[in-house]
Amino acid sequence: MKLVLKDLTKIYPPRGKGSAGAVVAVDGFDFEIPDGKLVGLLGPSGCGKSTALNLICGLLEPTRGQIFFGDEDVTELPPEKRGVGMVFQHYALYPHLTVLKNILFPLENLRGSEKLSKQEMLKRAYEAARVVQIENLMDSKPSELSGGQQQRVAIARALVKRPRVLLLDEPLSNLDARLRLQTREEIRRIQRETGITTVFVTHDQEEAMSISDMIVVMKDGVVQQIGAPQEVYDEPDNLFVAKFLGTPPINVFAGRVEAGKLFIGDEAVLEVAGVENQSVTAAIRPEGFQLDEIGAFTCALTGVEVMGRDITVIATHKACENAAIRAIIGAENKVDTAAKQVRFNLKPNKVFLFSENGERIPFTPSK
């Protein structure tokens, strides 16, 4: 089911005398999610991603804008009429009911022409359980399950109504690191197996990039960039996106462009044709450094971390915004850990320039 958002906006009015002005939680969200794709809404806490999800679900009414499922305008429809499956951050399972009863609950509350026979309800419940691989837990209570198993029950309950769109709100935030990795792989498998158009909300960029077909990066209610995860990582539209994506984080420097060259400190570190003379912010991905004894960029060496397949060189520079520069190089490199300085050349495709307002400045690297 294709999902289309047109100028979707949610504004909360001032709460009362002496309060701050109106809060724009989501501002002019335009987006089309192709049928059967998994899209990650990504951004820091308070950026509007959960509000956007609740607008799609129907739990909130938009201030303006439209929501389409396929060609149907569902903006005015209540949640139960939209055909959505929702999985909340805290799962919202009924503790006194078995897994089977929790999965059946949405079906038992259908009325009128939508009401199903008991046989059909059981069939659907076991089909959903099979998809999430919990058939052997149907007689258990939620308190007897691990966090990952509870998550699967919540997903099965959302799937049992055969929704047109599946919505997941921070579904992994309550799990430990091992279960998060395992469960996000399960979500990807389930989405591919069912083919349901899915919107996944998270503040964890690694989660979003690892399982999403597309990601939407948000800040202060405004969409910053939309695209395939690797595309957004490789070609950030602005400094916020560049800094938000990537682990370790991108290295950010105060720089300037003079005569087609990027200067960081007193060193000309890269040729950047097509850019006017100006002060810039230069951002360099950790993998954008090449160790070179006569390299153009000199930093103070503070440490080396050998990680097996690669090495992280930790350094400092007076023009760097980060507390430490982290440069990832291949394990075949030999770093003199006793040295006080380390020199690099920079990979042009891993260097980004931004203006004072944070917008990307394109440049042509030297041949």
Predicted regions and their residues:
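The feature captures the beta-strand-to-loop junction immediately N-terminal to the Walker
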Residues: 42-44
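ABC ATPase nucleotide-binding domain helices that frame the ATP-binding cleft
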Residues: 50-53, 153
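Conserved coupling/switch loops of ABC nucleotide-binding domains, chiefly the family-specific signature
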Residues: 63-66, 220, 351
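Conserved ABC transporter NBD signature motif
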Residues: 65-73
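Non-catalytic connector elements of ABC transporters
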Residues: 261-367
